[in-house]
Amino acid sequence: MKLDRPAILVVDMLNDFVTGALACDRGKGIVPATAALLDAAREAGVPVIFCNDAHLPGIDREFELWGPHAIAGSEGAQVIPELKVGEKDYVVPKRR
């Protein structure tokens, strides 16, 4: 990936934040437009980067505030199916 060109950064569009443990109604509302943007970006060769919560039980203090969510490897920590991580996309886990 060249570092001198634009990219699309998608943050925390995960099952737990859109339909699960910490669902946000506004998150659901942006899904169609986000999916269309990602399709257009990929078609144009613009890199797509997903930056996602991937918490580790027993380590992450965020659970004290919000309860368990987006646990690494769980269904809740997966990108929502409507946005489909592509084979050329990048996925960056956020641990804390």
Task: For the regions a language model picked out, list residue spans one by one.
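Active-site acidic carboxylates
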Residues: 1-91
